[in-house]
Every structure is written in structure tokens, then in C-alpha cells.
């Protein structure tokens, strides 16, 4: 994992990720793919986002989890948020016992990841292939958060899109980390806390992984 790369005195995280992106670009097979998986912590999300940024400069394309090839909105925002997804998981018995003793729940697994391919082999997410009945002017969003209550929006979730950081109302039923088809409302609201712009997901289009 990226957080276990050996530190070098005087070398920043950005420089470490740039060196790694160069190495991946030089060694990756033209039809290959490289997958980096981190714990779903703030550090893990920052490392994968920094790797993505430098990988693009080296001619690599992030094919997952990113639904676009633009700048990462989470690197641009001042909010302490990061790209990660959670899913239910069953811990080994010894870990479950320890978690109960420490009063730390271990019923889910949170990960940050980045999948890279050579630019010539990668293709942007095809909206019509994933969501045949999607609004032609719509946008694909990657869910980034658990559901949380927002006045006037029900249980909302944050998401990453080609338009930037977004908030999706009434999203309690969407799985964490899923890709969803959304449409842009005529008069989108903004999240007062983060400035995320409102998108409306199309529930008739099944969320994808």
C-alpha cells in the first residue's frame, strides 16, 4: 500500500507519488492495469488522489473509481473529505472479540483505491453502456460518502462528477462507492457546508459498481 512506501528525507508526498507514477508508466504493460488499494482513511484518500494527479501527467488514465478525467474535486476543496467507499464485512472471530472489548465496531470495511491504465488502452466511462435510459444531458456520479441528514434533502450523499463535488438528495438507498446516473436540476441548490452542487439521481437506472 502507498502509505508503506519508505519515506525519504526532504521528499514531499507529491514527489513520492510522482516518482511512483513515473515508475508505473515505464513498467506497465501496454494492455495492463495497475491497482493501488489503501485503507479508507484521510491519508489513504489523499495518497490515491495525489497518485492520480501525477499519473495523468505521465500519460496514465484513472479508470476507477473516477467517473471523469478532470481535476480531483477533493484535492481542490478545503473541506477535510477524501475519496473512499465502505461495504459490510465480517471480521475474523479474534478481531470481532477484540473490537467488542475495545468498543470499536468492525462490521464494515472502508477502502480508497486507484486503478490506472495506459492512456491508449483506457476509455472514459460510457454513459449509455452503463445507463441505457440515462438523461442525454445527465452526468455519472461516484458516491463518496455514507448517507447523512440534510434539511430539505432527506438523507443525502456526497459524490464526485465531471462537474466537480456534488451532493445528491434522497440517496439513502444508494450503496457506498456506487456509480449512479444523475440529472442536473434547473435550479440546483448548494450544500451550505461544502459548496457541493445538487444533482438528482435517476433511481430507475440501477446503481453500478
Q: What are the roles of these predicted feature ranges?
A:
Residues 1-14:
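A short SAM/SAH-binding and catalytic strip from SAM-dependent methyltransferases
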Residues 4, 35-38:
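Conserved beta-strand segments of the P-loop GTPase G domain that flank and frequently precede/overlap
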Residues 5-6, 43-45, 71-72:
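Short catalytic/ligand-binding loop motif for oxyanion handling, primarily in non-cytosolic enzymes
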Residues 12-36:
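A short glycine-rich, Lys/Arg-flanked "PGG" loop and its adjoining helix->strand segment in the class I
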Residues 14-17, 45-49:
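Conserved strand-to-helix beginnings and helix N-cap segments that scaffold or border functional pockets
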Residues 37-41, 66-67:
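Short strand-turn motif at the edge of the Rossmann-like AdoMet-binding core
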Residues 47-71, 76-89:
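Conserved Class I S-adenosyl-L-methionine
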Residues 82-209:
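C-terminal lobe and adjacent flexible extensions of AdoMet/dcAdoMet transferase-like proteins
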Amino acid at each position: 500500500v502507498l502509505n508503506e512506501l519508505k519515506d525519504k528525507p526532504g521528499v514531499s508526498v507529491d514527489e513520492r507519488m510522482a516518482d511512483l507514477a513515473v515508475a508505473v508508466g515505464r513498467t506497465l504493460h501496454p494492455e495492463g492495469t495497475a491497482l493501488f488499494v489503501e485503507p479508507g482513511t484521510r491519508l489513504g484518500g489523499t495518497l490515491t488522489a495525489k497518485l492520480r494527479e501525477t499519473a495523468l501527467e505521465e500519460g496514465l488514465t484513472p479508470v476507477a473509481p473516477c467517473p471523469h478525467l478532470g481535476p480531483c474535486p477533493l484535492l481542490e476543496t478545503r473541506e477535510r473529505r477524501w475519496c473512499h467507499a465502505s461495504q459490510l464485512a465480517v471480521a475474523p472471530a479474534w478481531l470481532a472479540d477484540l473490537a467488542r472489548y475495545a468498543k470499536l465496531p468492525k462490521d464494515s470495511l472502508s477502502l480508497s483505491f486507484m486503478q490506472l491504465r495506459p492512456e491508449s488502452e483506457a476509455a472514459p466511462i460510457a454513459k449509455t453502456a452503463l445507463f441505457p435510459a440515462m438523461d442525454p444531458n445527465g452526468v455519472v456520479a461516484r458516491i463518496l460518502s455514507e448517507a447523512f441528514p440534510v434539511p430539505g434533502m432527506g438523507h443525502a450523499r456526497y459524490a464526485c462528477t465531471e462537474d466537480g463535488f456534488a451532493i445528491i438528495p434522497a440517496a439513502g438507498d444508494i450503496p457506498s462507492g456506487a456509480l449512479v446516473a444523475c440529472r442536473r436540476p434547473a435550479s440546483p441548490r448548494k450544500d451550505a457546508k461544502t459548496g457541493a452542487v445538487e444533482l438528482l439521481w435517476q433511481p430507475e437506472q440501477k446503481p453500478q459498481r
